[in-house]
Amino acid sequence: MRSMTKGRPHTKIKTTTGGINMTNTYNDVPEVERETADGIRTVSLLTDALTGRKVFLFGNIDESLVFSFTMQMLNLMEDEQSEINIYINSPGGEVNAGLAIYDLIQSCRAPINMYCVGMAASMGAVIFAGGQKGRRFILPHSKVMIHEPLIPLGVGGSVSSVKNTADLMMQTRQELNEILAKHTGKNIEEVNRATEYNNYMDAKEAVAFGICDWVTDDLM
């Protein structure tokens, strides 16, 4: 039985939402033996998890993660009746990459359970909040962090180009905050205030804010 606590932009520049550095590598995933019609086979636990309709969003959100996630989801989305479990542990990353993942999740007709395992920060929090209502779960000691997008390092040039970058960043901020408002039930003014700083929330606070629905200790 699941243990739960109920709580109540599109730009041309590569924008990031900040966050700590994590690499997207699963080279150390162990293998297990499985009995098949052709005999005993050794398979990666990631392959085994995908067979069980489990997908992982771990690490920095970038183009490589989008590619991996899209390939897995397109395979699973062919079955619109069976649940998909998505586990997220991400410090954030590139906005455009994150919005691609967000859009893919929104387009999925299959029921999706979303689990925050450790951290959903920055763009990761936007993706997590965009999970299906009533199916967004967070572990008791996991954290969520929301904030404004960050200007990419090295941005410079003429006054006009800097102004153009600033305008694009404001559009991105508005787009991300509108997504958060849509999925949390907060009005846009509340979200604007909440994202003015690195706003860290524990599991219960994330439920209260509307980013997720349940605190759980059951990942199945």
Language-model regions, residue ranges each:
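Terminal-region recognition feature
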Residues: 2-220
